[in-house]
Design a protein with these regions (language model features):
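Conserved ABC transporter NBD signature motif
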Residues: 69-80
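Hydrophobic anchor residue at the start of the ABC signature
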Residues: 118, 170, 194
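A short, proline-enriched helix->beta-strand linker immediately N-terminal to the Walker B motif
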Residues: 175-179
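Catalytic Walker B motif of ABC-type/P-loop ATPase nucleotide-binding domains
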Residues: 181-184
Length: 194
């Protein structure tokens, strides 16, 4: 029999509902799955079936209110993510749990350079010094196929094509080597080379 600690992620009867002016919306209604370390799980469904909300719920990124979880649990190892305080979940996000969002244009801050957005991840989660964080960020941009990464890192998101912005999002999600990576249509804007 498998134990909870054998699974890196276990979602049990997750329900994410939203209270709206038009009534209750059951975006996720009874989803369960497990992911073992090193395993890949694909969630497939029609548009609007709750795939993105499932990932956002697991990362604790749905706004409460209007969202709420009438039942369910999301275990990361032996820890139920739904029972954590906001500071506790923030310690896990970015370092041990990461997400590549569907739309990099709205996920990247247009007022900050790519360098600032990438290095902040390392400075916050790994106490990296600015120079080391910059070096690691440039290396990650190179790994995801951004040419001239050492100069492009100082540009703003609007100076990148859609595919290059998506590569920045992938680099950001991978920077800390997370144990669980949620990828919400991560290759929509990419060419086939990544």
């Amino acid at each position: 029999m498998e134990t909870r600690s054998e699974n890196v992620l276990e979602v049990c009867d997750l329900r994410t509902h939203f209270r709206t002016d038009d009534g209750l919306v059951k975006a996720v209604d009874g989803v369960s799955f497990t992911v073992k370390r090193g395993e890949t799980l694909g969630i497939v469904g029609e548009s609007g079936s709750g795939k993105s909300v499932t990932c956002l719920s697991a990362m604790r990124l749905v706004s409460k209110p209007p969202a709420f979880h009438p039942t369910g649990a999301i275990y990361f190892g032996d820890t139920n993510l739904l029972s954590l305080t906001e500071p506790e979940i923030q310690k896990l996000r970015g370092e041990r749990l990461a997400m590549i969002f569907q739309d990099p244009l709205t996920s990247l801050n247009p007022y900050l350079t790519v360098a600032r957005q990438l290095t902040e991840v390392l400075e916050v989660h790994q106490d990296a010094r600015p120079a080391a964080a910059r070096r690691t960020s440039i290396e990650m941009l190179e790994r995801v196929g951004i040419p001239d990464a050492d100069s492009r890192i100082d540009q703003y998101p609007h100076q990148f094509s859609g595919g290059m912005r998506q590569r920045v999002m992938i680099a950001m999600a991978l920077l800390c080597g997370p144990e669980v990576l949620f990828a919400d249509e991560p290759t929509t804007a990419l060419d086939v080379t990544i």
